[in-house]
Swiss-Prot record:
Taxonomy, superkingdom: Bacteria
Organism annotation: Deinococcus radiodurans (strain ATCC 13939 / DSM 20539 / JCM 16871 / CCUG 27074 / LMG 4051 / NBRC 15346 / NCIMB 9279 / VKM B-1422 / R1)
A Gene Ontology molecular function term of the record: rRNA binding
Family according to the record: Belongs to the universal ribosomal protein uS19 family.
Ribonucleoprotein found in the keyword field: yes
Ribonucleoprotein keyword on record: yes
Keywords per UniProt: Ribonucleoprotein, Ribosomal protein, RNA-binding, rRNA-binding
One GO term of the biological process aspect: translation
Pfam families, per database record: Ribosomal_S19
Function description: Protein S19 forms a complex with S13 that binds strongly to the 16S ribosomal RNA.
Species classification: Bacteria, Thermotogati, Deinococcota, Deinococci, Deinococcales
Region (Disordered): 73-95
Protein name: Small ribosomal subunit protein uS19
Length: 95
């Protein structure tokens, strides 16, 4: 269920303050954050935000297509290594 329009998008205050401060200085340093739940807003376009995935900070470069999505969508928390190989697939078939 999406958030109500009268409330507006959720963005952590500390993250928005850091983005606004860099916009005022015209600075584009990497911003580290643990806030995966923050919504990407137009002020963040062009910034690189390092989002924590539980192990490390994954750099996410924000562009126009990401507006309205959450930061956590671009920092996967699980690694997929593929399904296990079939033991009989190597060539030793039973007859």
């Amino acid at each position: 269920m999406p958030r109500s329009l009268k409330k507006g998008p959720f963005v952590e205050d500390h993250l928005l303050k850091k983005v606004d401060a860099q916009n005022d200085k015209k600075d584009k340093r990497v911003i580290k954050t643990w806030s995966r739940r923050s919504t990407i807003v137009p002020e963040m376009i062009g910034h690189t935000i390092a989002v924590y995935n539980g192990k490390q900070h994954v750099p996410v470069f924000v562009n126009e297509q990401m507006i309205g999505h959450k930061l956590g969508e671009f920092s996967p928390t699980r690694t997929y290594r593929g399904h296990g190989a079939d033991k009989n697939a190597k060539g030793s078939k039973k007859k």
